[in-house]
């Protein structure tokens, strides 16, 4: 992740994880090429992965979603990071949203 500058600028957010049991990540992307592209929800505050969506499907614009169980407490800065298994197929990020689910 963060191999190219564009991957480092995919937006950030602040979430208070106190009392949160799960977080839903939805990313809107334009998948280019045939490799597997991974979209990671990254806890920037603690330098830990919250979860990853791996997309090995067909190319094109799509919305991907996953739910991750969390056991974090307090306010964390989070961001989306991306990578591809194929060097020339840089992921194209179109937007993201997170939805915290209370325990």
Feature map (PLM): residue ranges:
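Polar, enzyme-active/binding microenvironments
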Residues: 1-103
